[in-house]
Protein backbone atom coordinates (compact mmCIF):
# COMPACT_ATOMS: atom_id res chain seq x y z
CA UNK A 1 0.00 0.00 0.00
CA UNK A 2 1.40 3.41 -0.96
CA UNK A 3 1.46 6.43 1.34
CA UNK A 4 -1.52 8.10 -0.38
CA UNK A 5 -3.70 5.06 0.26
CA UNK A 6 -2.55 4.87 3.87
CA UNK A 7 -3.35 8.54 4.41
CA UNK A 8 -6.74 8.14 2.74
CA UNK A 9 -7.63 5.21 4.99
CA UNK A 10 -6.57 7.20 8.04
CA UNK A 11 -8.38 10.34 6.88
CA UNK A 12 -11.66 8.45 6.56
CA UNK A 13 -11.52 7.70 10.28
CA UNK A 14 -11.65 11.40 11.17
CA UNK A 15 -12.94 13.33 8.13
CA UNK A 16 -16.25 12.45 6.41
CA UNK A 17 -15.25 10.62 3.24
CA UNK A 18 -11.61 11.38 3.99
CA UNK A 19 -11.74 14.77 2.27
CA UNK A 20 -12.80 18.33 3.05
CA UNK A 21 -14.61 18.86 -0.25
CA UNK A 22 -16.47 15.98 -1.96
CA UNK A 23 -14.98 16.18 -5.47
CA UNK A 24 -11.50 15.54 -4.02
CA UNK A 25 -12.52 11.99 -3.09
CA UNK A 26 -12.27 10.84 -6.75
CA UNK A 27 -15.77 9.32 -6.56
CA UNK A 28 -16.48 10.85 -9.95
CA UNK A 29 -13.84 8.53 -11.43
CA UNK A 30 -14.45 5.55 -9.12
CA UNK A 31 -11.07 5.75 -7.42
CA UNK A 32 -9.01 7.00 -4.51
CA UNK A 33 -7.28 10.38 -4.32
CA UNK A 34 -3.56 10.94 -4.18
CA UNK A 35 -2.27 13.11 -1.33
CA UNK A 36 -0.13 16.12 -2.21
CA UNK A 37 3.14 16.87 -0.44
CA UNK A 38 4.19 20.02 -2.30
CA UNK A 39 3.79 21.99 -5.51
CA UNK A 40 5.82 24.30 -7.71
CA UNK A 41 5.17 25.98 -11.03
CA UNK A 42 2.94 23.77 -13.18
CA UNK A 43 3.53 20.66 -11.05
CA UNK A 44 2.10 18.82 -8.06
CA UNK A 45 4.15 16.25 -6.13
CA UNK A 46 2.40 13.55 -4.13
CA UNK A 47 3.52 11.85 -0.92
CA UNK A 48 4.77 8.88 -2.94
CA UNK A 49 7.22 11.01 -4.90
CA UNK A 50 5.28 11.22 -8.17
CA UNK A 51 5.11 14.46 -10.15
CA UNK A 52 2.03 15.59 -12.07
CA UNK A 53 1.47 18.35 -14.61
CA UNK A 54 -1.40 20.12 -12.90
CA UNK A 55 -4.44 21.25 -14.90
CA UNK A 56 -6.61 21.61 -11.78
CA UNK A 57 -4.71 24.48 -10.16
CA UNK A 58 -6.41 24.12 -6.76
CA UNK A 59 -9.72 24.29 -8.70
CA UNK A 60 -8.85 27.59 -10.32
CA UNK A 61 -6.89 29.96 -8.06
CA UNK A 62 -3.35 29.09 -9.19
CA UNK A 63 -3.36 31.05 -12.43
CA UNK A 64 0.27 32.13 -11.93
CA UNK A 65 1.33 28.61 -11.04
CA UNK A 66 2.22 27.13 -7.68
CA UNK A 67 4.53 28.89 -5.23
CA UNK A 68 4.87 31.98 -7.40
CA UNK A 69 7.61 34.21 -5.94
CA UNK A 70 5.50 37.39 -6.11
CA UNK A 71 2.82 35.85 -3.91
CA UNK A 72 5.27 34.09 -1.59
CA UNK A 73 7.16 37.35 -1.04
CA UNK A 74 3.93 39.23 -0.31
CA UNK A 75 2.89 36.65 2.27
CA UNK A 76 6.32 36.62 3.91
CA UNK A 77 6.28 40.40 4.32
CA UNK A 78 2.68 40.49 5.53
CA UNK A 79 3.11 37.85 8.21
CA UNK A 80 5.92 39.86 9.80
CA UNK A 81 3.28 42.40 10.86
CA UNK A 82 0.91 39.84 12.36
CA UNK A 83 -1.61 37.27 11.24
CA UNK A 84 -5.07 38.69 11.93
CA UNK A 85 -6.32 41.89 13.56
CA UNK A 86 -10.10 42.04 13.27
CA UNK A 87 -9.73 45.70 12.39
CA UNK A 88 -9.43 47.66 9.12
CA UNK A 89 -6.06 47.68 7.34
CA UNK A 90 -4.56 49.65 4.47
CA UNK A 91 -4.11 46.55 2.32
CA UNK A 92 -7.85 45.82 2.24
CA UNK A 93 -8.50 49.38 1.02
CA UNK A 94 -5.87 48.96 -1.71
CA UNK A 95 -7.41 45.62 -2.64
CA UNK A 96 -10.90 47.13 -2.91
CA UNK A 97 -9.56 49.98 -5.06
CA UNK A 98 -7.82 47.53 -7.38
CA UNK A 99 -10.91 45.34 -7.73
CA UNK A 100 -13.11 48.28 -8.67
CA UNK A 101 -10.53 49.39 -11.24
CA UNK A 102 -10.35 45.94 -12.83
CA UNK A 103 -14.12 45.34 -12.67
CA UNK A 104 -15.79 48.62 -13.77
CA UNK A 105 -19.29 47.31 -12.89
CA UNK A 106 -18.23 47.26 -9.23
CA UNK A 107 -18.56 50.69 -7.63
CA UNK A 108 -18.11 49.18 -4.18
CA UNK A 109 -16.97 45.79 -2.90
CA UNK A 110 -17.21 43.75 0.30
CA UNK A 111 -14.53 41.15 1.06
CA UNK A 112 -15.50 37.67 2.31
CA UNK A 113 -13.72 34.32 2.63
CA UNK A 114 -15.34 31.97 0.10
CA UNK A 115 -17.36 31.93 -3.08
CA UNK A 116 -20.28 30.45 -1.16
CA UNK A 117 -20.30 33.45 1.19
CA UNK A 118 -20.08 35.83 -1.77
CA UNK A 119 -23.08 34.38 -3.62
CA UNK A 120 -25.11 33.90 -0.45
CA UNK A 121 -24.52 37.52 0.56
CA UNK A 122 -25.18 38.87 -2.94
CA UNK A 123 -28.54 37.11 -3.06
CA UNK A 124 -29.50 38.43 0.39
CA UNK A 125 -28.53 41.90 -0.78
CA UNK A 126 -30.57 41.54 -4.00
CA UNK A 127 -33.60 40.42 -2.00
CA UNK A 128 -33.21 43.31 0.39
CA UNK A 129 -32.82 45.83 -2.42
CA UNK A 130 -35.76 44.62 -4.52
CA UNK A 131 -37.95 43.52 -1.58
CA UNK A 132 -38.59 40.28 -3.49
CA UNK A 133 -37.92 36.68 -2.46
CA UNK A 134 -37.45 34.52 -5.54
CA UNK A 135 -34.26 33.99 -7.52
CA UNK A 136 -33.56 32.33 -10.85
CA UNK A 137 -30.61 30.01 -11.33
CA UNK A 138 -29.67 27.57 -14.07
CA UNK A 139 -29.69 23.79 -13.98
CA UNK A 140 -26.14 22.48 -13.56
CA UNK A 141 -24.71 25.80 -12.38
CA UNK A 142 -23.07 25.77 -8.96
CA UNK A 143 -22.94 28.86 -6.79
CA UNK A 144 -21.70 27.41 -3.53
CA UNK A 145 -23.46 25.36 -0.89
CA UNK A 146 -25.87 27.80 0.74
CA UNK A 147 -29.35 26.32 1.08
CA UNK A 148 -31.19 28.31 -1.58
CA UNK A 149 -28.54 27.50 -4.21
CA UNK A 150 -28.28 23.72 -3.74
CA UNK A 151 -31.16 23.18 -6.15
CA UNK A 152 -30.24 21.54 -9.46
CA UNK A 153 -26.64 22.40 -8.64
CA UNK A 154 -23.47 21.55 -10.54
CA UNK A 155 -19.89 20.78 -9.46
CA UNK A 156 -19.52 18.14 -6.74
CA UNK A 157 -23.30 17.76 -6.47
CA UNK A 158 -23.36 16.48 -10.06
CA UNK A 159 -20.29 14.33 -9.50
CA UNK A 160 -22.06 12.56 -6.63
CA UNK A 161 -25.34 12.33 -8.50
CA UNK A 162 -27.01 14.73 -6.06
CA UNK A 163 -28.41 17.68 -7.96
CA UNK A 164 -30.41 18.55 -4.85
CA UNK A 165 -29.23 18.15 -1.26
CA UNK A 166 -31.06 16.67 1.71
CA UNK A 167 -31.23 19.18 4.52
CA UNK A 168 -32.54 22.01 2.34
CA UNK A 169 -36.08 22.86 3.57
CA UNK A 170 -38.78 22.98 0.92
CA UNK A 171 -39.66 26.46 2.15
CA UNK A 172 -36.19 27.59 1.04
CA UNK A 173 -36.14 25.70 -2.24
CA UNK A 174 -39.53 27.02 -3.34
CA UNK A 175 -38.01 30.46 -3.82
CA UNK A 176 -35.39 29.13 -6.26
CA UNK A 177 -36.65 28.92 -9.84
CA UNK A 178 -34.72 26.74 -12.29
CA UNK A 179 -34.08 27.55 -15.93
CA UNK A 180 -32.09 25.92 -18.71
CA UNK A 181 -28.67 27.42 -19.45
CA UNK A 182 -28.57 29.13 -22.85
CA UNK A 183 -32.40 29.10 -23.07
CA UNK A 184 -33.85 32.59 -22.72
CA UNK A 185 -37.41 31.37 -23.27
CA UNK A 186 -37.28 29.39 -20.01
CA UNK A 187 -36.14 32.53 -18.20
CA UNK A 188 -38.89 34.68 -19.65
CA UNK A 189 -41.51 32.08 -18.72
CA UNK A 190 -40.44 32.09 -15.06
CA UNK A 191 -40.37 35.88 -14.96
CA UNK A 192 -43.86 36.04 -16.48
CA UNK A 193 -45.17 33.30 -14.16
CA UNK A 194 -43.90 35.20 -11.10
CA UNK A 195 -44.28 38.90 -11.96
CA UNK A 196 -42.66 41.26 -9.45
CA UNK A 197 -41.47 38.29 -7.34
CA UNK A 198 -37.98 37.61 -8.77
CA UNK A 199 -35.21 39.49 -6.97
CA UNK A 200 -32.32 38.35 -9.14
CA UNK A 201 -30.99 36.07 -11.81
CA UNK A 202 -27.67 34.50 -10.82
CA UNK A 203 -25.55 33.00 -13.58
CA UNK A 204 -22.09 31.67 -14.28
CA UNK A 205 -21.23 33.62 -17.46
CA UNK A 206 -19.24 30.55 -18.49
CA UNK A 207 -20.71 27.51 -16.75
CA UNK A 208 -17.64 25.88 -15.23
CA UNK A 209 -19.39 23.57 -12.81
CA UNK A 210 -20.96 21.31 -15.40
CA UNK A 211 -17.58 21.16 -17.09
CA UNK A 212 -17.15 24.16 -19.43
CA UNK A 213 -20.26 25.46 -21.18
CA UNK A 214 -19.97 28.69 -23.14
CA UNK A 215 -22.87 31.13 -23.39
CA UNK A 216 -24.59 31.45 -26.75
CA UNK A 217 -24.22 34.79 -28.51
CA UNK A 218 -27.50 36.23 -27.25
CA UNK A 219 -27.72 34.55 -23.83
CA UNK A 220 -25.96 37.03 -21.54
CA UNK A 221 -27.28 40.16 -23.36
CA UNK A 222 -30.72 38.56 -23.18
CA UNK A 223 -30.44 38.06 -19.43
CA UNK A 224 -29.45 41.71 -19.00
CA UNK A 225 -32.45 42.79 -21.06
CA UNK A 226 -34.87 40.54 -19.15
CA UNK A 227 -33.60 41.78 -15.79
CA UNK A 228 -34.17 45.36 -16.89
CA UNK A 229 -37.62 44.52 -18.23
CA UNK A 230 -38.82 42.75 -15.08
CA UNK A 231 -37.00 44.78 -12.43
CA UNK A 232 -34.67 41.99 -11.28
CA UNK A 233 -30.95 42.30 -10.57
CA UNK A 234 -28.38 40.44 -12.66
CA UNK A 235 -25.78 38.69 -10.51
CA UNK A 236 -22.74 37.35 -12.34
CA UNK A 237 -20.98 34.59 -10.45
CA UNK A 238 -17.41 35.18 -11.65
CA UNK A 239 -15.81 33.12 -8.89
CA UNK A 240 -14.33 30.94 -11.62
CA UNK A 241 -14.18 33.25 -14.65
CA UNK A 242 -13.02 36.39 -12.87
CA UNK A 243 -9.50 37.37 -14.03
CA UNK A 244 -9.23 34.04 -15.91
CA UNK A 245 -11.10 34.49 -19.20
CA UNK A 246 -9.98 38.13 -19.30
CA UNK A 247 -8.45 40.56 -16.84
CA UNK A 248 -11.90 42.08 -16.28
CA UNK A 249 -13.57 38.68 -16.25
CA UNK A 250 -16.30 37.35 -18.51
CA UNK A 251 -18.23 40.61 -18.16
CA UNK A 252 -15.36 42.38 -19.91
CA UNK A 253 -15.03 39.68 -22.55
CA UNK A 254 -18.76 39.62 -23.35
CA UNK A 255 -19.32 43.34 -22.64
CA UNK A 256 -22.12 42.82 -20.11
CA UNK A 257 -22.63 45.00 -17.04
CA UNK A 258 -24.20 43.09 -14.12
CA UNK A 259 -25.72 44.73 -11.07
CA UNK A 260 -23.69 42.54 -8.71
CA UNK A 261 -20.59 40.41 -9.22
CA UNK A 262 -19.25 37.56 -7.10
CA UNK A 263 -15.51 36.86 -7.13
CA UNK A 264 -13.26 34.23 -5.59
CA UNK A 265 -10.47 31.76 -6.35
CA UNK A 266 -7.90 33.91 -8.22
CA UNK A 267 -8.45 37.04 -6.11
CA UNK A 268 -6.82 35.32 -3.13
CA UNK A 269 -3.75 34.07 -4.99
CA UNK A 270 -4.32 30.69 -3.33
CA UNK A 271 -5.56 32.04 0.00
CA UNK A 272 -9.25 31.77 1.04
CA UNK A 273 -10.55 35.09 -0.28
CA UNK A 274 -13.74 36.08 -2.08
CA UNK A 275 -15.78 39.22 -2.66
CA UNK A 276 -19.06 40.58 -3.90
CA UNK A 277 -19.67 44.04 -5.24
CA UNK A 278 -21.61 46.14 -7.69
CA UNK A 279 -23.63 49.30 -8.14
CA UNK A 280 -23.23 51.82 -5.34
CA UNK A 281 -27.01 52.16 -5.09
CA UNK A 282 -27.29 48.46 -4.25
CA UNK A 283 -24.17 48.12 -2.11
CA UNK A 284 -25.19 51.13 0.01
CA UNK A 285 -27.98 49.18 1.73
CA UNK A 286 -25.39 46.75 3.15
CA UNK A 287 -24.60 47.09 6.87
CA UNK A 288 -23.32 49.29 8.43
CA UNK A 289 -24.70 51.77 5.86
CA UNK A 290 -28.03 50.02 5.48
CA UNK A 291 -30.29 47.31 6.90
CA UNK A 292 -29.02 44.23 5.00
CA UNK A 293 -26.72 42.47 7.42
CA UNK A 294 -23.47 40.69 6.54
CA UNK A 295 -20.44 40.18 8.78
CA UNK A 296 -17.46 37.87 9.27
CA UNK A 297 -14.63 37.50 11.75
CA UNK A 298 -11.85 36.99 9.21
CA UNK A 299 -13.06 38.98 6.20
CA UNK A 300 -10.40 41.24 4.72
CA UNK A 301 -7.78 39.01 6.32
CA UNK A 302 -4.39 40.73 5.94
CA UNK A 303 -2.59 37.66 4.60
CA UNK A 304 -5.30 36.97 2.05
CA UNK A 305 -5.38 40.63 1.01
CA UNK A 306 -1.60 40.67 0.58
CA UNK A 307 -1.60 37.52 -1.55
CA UNK A 308 -4.59 38.65 -3.60
CA UNK A 309 -3.25 42.14 -4.22
CA UNK A 310 0.09 40.70 -5.35
CA UNK A 311 -1.63 38.17 -7.63
CA UNK A 312 -3.91 40.69 -9.33
CA UNK A 313 -1.14 43.26 -9.69
CA UNK A 314 0.99 40.65 -11.44
CA UNK A 315 -1.91 39.54 -13.64
CA UNK A 316 -2.51 43.13 -14.74
CA UNK A 317 0.86 43.23 -16.52
CA UNK A 318 0.32 43.59 -20.29
CA UNK A 319 0.26 40.44 -22.39
CA UNK A 320 -0.32 37.82 -19.70
CA UNK A 321 -3.90 36.97 -20.65
CA UNK A 322 -2.92 36.80 -24.31
CA UNK A 323 -0.25 34.27 -23.33
CA UNK A 324 -2.73 32.31 -21.20
CA UNK A 325 -5.18 32.10 -24.09
CA UNK A 326 -2.43 31.01 -26.48
CA UNK A 327 -1.32 28.22 -24.13
CA UNK A 328 -4.89 26.97 -23.68
CA UNK A 329 -5.56 27.11 -27.41
CA UNK A 330 -2.36 25.18 -28.14
CA UNK A 331 -3.43 22.43 -25.74
CA UNK A 332 -7.01 22.28 -27.02
CA UNK A 333 -6.25 22.26 -30.74
CA UNK A 334 -3.66 19.52 -30.40
CA UNK A 335 -5.88 17.39 -28.14
CA UNK A 336 -8.67 17.68 -30.71
CA UNK A 337 -6.26 16.71 -33.47
CA UNK A 338 -5.04 13.69 -31.49
CA UNK A 339 -8.62 12.55 -30.93
CA UNK A 340 -9.50 12.98 -34.61
CA UNK A 341 -6.48 10.92 -35.65
CA UNK A 342 -7.96 7.98 -33.74
CA UNK A 343 -11.63 8.66 -34.53
CA UNK A 344 -12.43 9.57 -30.93
CA UNK A 345 -15.50 11.85 -30.73
CA UNK A 346 -14.37 14.72 -28.52
CA UNK A 347 -15.62 18.26 -28.03
CA UNK A 348 -13.42 20.68 -26.09
CA UNK A 349 -14.93 24.00 -25.10
CA UNK A 350 -12.49 26.68 -23.98
CA UNK A 351 -12.16 30.36 -23.22
CA UNK A 352 -9.15 32.20 -21.84
CA UNK A 353 -7.46 29.91 -19.32
CA UNK A 354 -10.28 27.38 -18.86
CA UNK A 355 -11.40 24.37 -20.87
CA UNK A 356 -13.57 21.26 -20.70
CA UNK A 357 -13.65 17.78 -22.30
CA UNK A 358 -16.84 16.16 -23.62
CA UNK A 359 -16.60 12.67 -25.08
CA UNK A 360 -19.71 12.75 -27.24
CA UNK A 361 -20.98 12.26 -30.79
CA UNK A 362 -23.03 15.44 -30.47
CA UNK A 363 -22.09 18.50 -32.48
CA UNK A 364 -22.35 20.90 -29.54
CA UNK A 365 -22.71 20.84 -25.76
CA UNK A 366 -24.69 23.84 -24.55
CA UNK A 367 -26.56 22.88 -21.36
CA UNK A 368 -26.80 20.43 -18.47
CA UNK A 369 -28.91 17.91 -20.43
CA UNK A 370 -26.21 17.78 -23.13
CA UNK A 371 -23.52 17.18 -20.50
CA UNK A 372 -25.44 14.26 -18.98
CA UNK A 373 -25.50 12.51 -22.36
CA UNK A 374 -21.70 12.49 -22.70
CA UNK A 375 -19.66 9.29 -22.32
CA UNK A 376 -18.62 9.44 -18.66
CA UNK A 377 -17.00 5.99 -18.73
CA UNK A 378 -14.71 7.08 -21.56
CA UNK A 379 -13.78 10.16 -19.57
CA UNK A 380 -12.84 7.96 -16.60
CA UNK A 381 -10.54 5.85 -18.79
CA UNK A 382 -8.96 9.00 -20.18
CA UNK A 383 -8.49 10.45 -16.69
CA UNK A 384 -6.68 7.40 -15.29
CA UNK A 385 -4.48 6.86 -18.33
CA UNK A 386 -3.35 10.47 -18.15
CA UNK A 387 -2.89 10.32 -14.37
CA UNK A 388 -0.56 7.33 -14.74
CA UNK A 389 1.38 9.37 -17.29
CA UNK A 390 1.78 12.18 -14.77
CA UNK A 391 -0.97 14.43 -16.13
CA UNK A 392 -3.58 15.60 -13.62
CA UNK A 393 -6.94 16.71 -14.96
CA UNK A 394 -10.00 17.28 -12.77
CA UNK A 395 -11.25 13.93 -11.37
CA UNK A 396 -14.78 14.52 -12.62
CA UNK A 397 -16.46 14.86 -16.00
CA UNK A 398 -18.40 17.80 -14.57
CA UNK A 399 -15.45 20.05 -13.72
CA UNK A 400 -13.56 22.51 -15.91
CA UNK A 401 -9.81 22.37 -16.43
CA UNK A 402 -7.42 25.27 -15.86
CA UNK A 403 -4.26 26.43 -17.57
CA UNK A 404 -1.68 28.44 -15.64
CA UNK A 405 0.99 30.86 -16.77
CA UNK A 406 3.58 28.44 -15.36
CA UNK A 407 2.69 25.88 -18.04
CA UNK A 408 4.87 25.94 -21.11
CA UNK A 409 5.28 24.22 -24.45
CA UNK A 410 7.16 21.35 -22.80
CA UNK A 411 4.24 20.51 -20.48
CA UNK A 412 1.72 20.82 -23.28
CA UNK A 413 3.74 18.61 -25.64
CA UNK A 414 4.00 15.93 -22.94
CA UNK A 415 0.25 16.14 -22.39
CA UNK A 416 -0.47 15.73 -26.10
CA UNK A 417 1.95 12.83 -26.42
CA UNK A 418 0.26 11.03 -23.53
CA UNK A 419 -3.19 11.71 -24.98
CA UNK A 420 -2.15 10.20 -28.32
CA UNK A 421 -1.07 7.01 -26.57
CA UNK A 422 -4.36 6.98 -24.68
CA UNK A 423 -6.49 7.42 -27.79
CA UNK A 424 -4.51 4.75 -29.65
CA UNK A 425 -5.64 2.02 -27.24
CA UNK A 426 -8.17 -0.33 -28.82
CA UNK A 427 -10.24 -0.46 -25.62
CA UNK A 428 -10.54 3.31 -25.41
UniProtKB/Swiss-Prot annotation:
Keywords, alphabetical: Cytoplasm, Isomerase, Porphyrin biosynthesis, Pyridoxal phosphate
Cystine pairs annotated here are none
Q: According to its UniProt record, which reaction does this protein catalyse?
A: (S)-4-amino-5-oxopentanoate = 5-aminolevulinate
Q: In which pathway does it act?
A: Porphyrin-containing compound metabolism; protoporphyrin-IX biosynthesis; 5-aminolevulinate from L-glutamyl-tRNA(Glu): step 2/2
Q: Where in the cell is it found?
A: Cytoplasm
Where are its TM segments located? none
Which GO terms label this protein's molecular function in UniProt? Answer: glutamate-1-semialdehyde 2,1-aminomutase activity; pyridoxal phosphate binding; transaminase activity
Does the keyword Isomerase feature in the UniProt annotation?
yes
- Family annotation (Pfam families): Aminotran_3 (PF00202)
Necessary cofactors: pyridoxal 5'-phosphate
Tell me the PANTHER family matching this sequence: GLUTAMATE-1-SEMIALDEHYDE 2,1-AMINOMUTASE, GLUTAMATE-1-SEMIALDEHYDE 2,1-AMINOMUTASE 1, CHLOROPLASTIC-RELATED
- The protein in question is named Glutamate-1-semialdehyde 2,1-aminomutase
Q: Give the originating organism.
A: Hamiltonella defensa subsp. Acyrthosiphon pisum (strain 5AT)
Amino acid sequence: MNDSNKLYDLAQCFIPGGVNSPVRAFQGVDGKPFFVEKAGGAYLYDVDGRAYIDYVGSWGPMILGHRHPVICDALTKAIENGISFGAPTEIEVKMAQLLTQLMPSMDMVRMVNSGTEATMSAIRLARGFTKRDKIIKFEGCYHGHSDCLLVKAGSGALTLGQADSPGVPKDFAQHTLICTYNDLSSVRKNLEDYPKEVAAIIVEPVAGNMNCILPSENFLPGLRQLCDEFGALLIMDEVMTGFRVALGGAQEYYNIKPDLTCLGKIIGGGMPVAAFGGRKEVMSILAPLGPVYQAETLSGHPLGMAAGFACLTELARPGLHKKLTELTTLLVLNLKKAAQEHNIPLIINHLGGMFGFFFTDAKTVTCYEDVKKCNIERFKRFFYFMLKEGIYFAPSAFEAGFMSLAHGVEEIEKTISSARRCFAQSRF
